[in-house]
Amino acid sequence: EDHVKKVKIVRKLEKKHNRFICILGDLQGPKFRVGKFTNVKEQLKKNQEFTFDQNKKDGDSKRVYLPHKEIFKSISVGQRLLVNDGKVRLKVKSKSPTSIKCLVTDGGEISNNKGLNIPDTKLDLKIITPKDKKDLQLAIKLDVDWIALSFIQTTKDLLTAKKLIPSKFKVMVKVEKPSAMDEIESITENCDGIMVARGDLGVETNPEDVPIHQRTMVAACRKFGRPCIVATQMLESMIDSPTPTRAEASDVATAVFQGVDAVMLSAESAAGNYPKEAVEMMDKIIKRVESDSKYLANIQNYNLDHTKTSTEAIATAALEVASIASCNCIATFSQ
């Protein structure tokens, strides 16, 4: 009911302000969580052993139930398991069909139903879960514009999921798994848009790798003419502050200079104390970058390593003419 109400509000505002607003239906995808603990939470210490198993009994400081058989099947010795957004890190020492014995490499708190990430493992799982199918039907009923797919690992995952989505809906791939980067060009070519989902991607990769992955995804989107969204922690401090940090302003500006099509707010507008100010600040940064003389030159100078079609050639020429003549808009024929 909440989603239905919000969609109606957006469509009403579209008419009021005469602006087209895209609505994206975000499918959660496969989400892994640990079981429960007798004492609700436990403190794991570095270098201790800890086991994930198929025993449904409440956990303690030495073990916990993991209700995902596909992990036991796919994970290998030496691979990592990350709990609580990567705050607790473990490495697999040994495994059996019903048990994964680990060494804690970074200790911390683990508690009931905390999320689990497996960055080094390609899992054999259903990308569209039963919950996703139910949510997809609601998205179709609400006539959203885009469907976002979470935790896509391979092109095969994408193509399998697309079979369940009516062709009238655009498909956005949220790149959250490092394994997706191995096939990023193929994934980009076979979807309608890419979201650089830096939250889960940042948990499963090293912090220094995330900016490189972002540039790679933006380049792939430019190569295949796909929209690209950069998301997560863009103005994170504005959840509690009316102004961003200088680093956050620079982060947003860098994404715009790279040529992305959209920058996205998450908790800043969904749960923050300054949602209006966060949107206004994001808008100011975008407009400031786009008014910079080097911005257009930067965009035009990107190397597109594919053969330009006649349509692309005409569009490129139209862009240059519009820039030189300071045109407010470009009119095109749809057929």
What is each stretch, according to the model?
Residues E1-Q335:
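Non-catalytic helical/linker scaffolds that mediate oligomerization, partner binding
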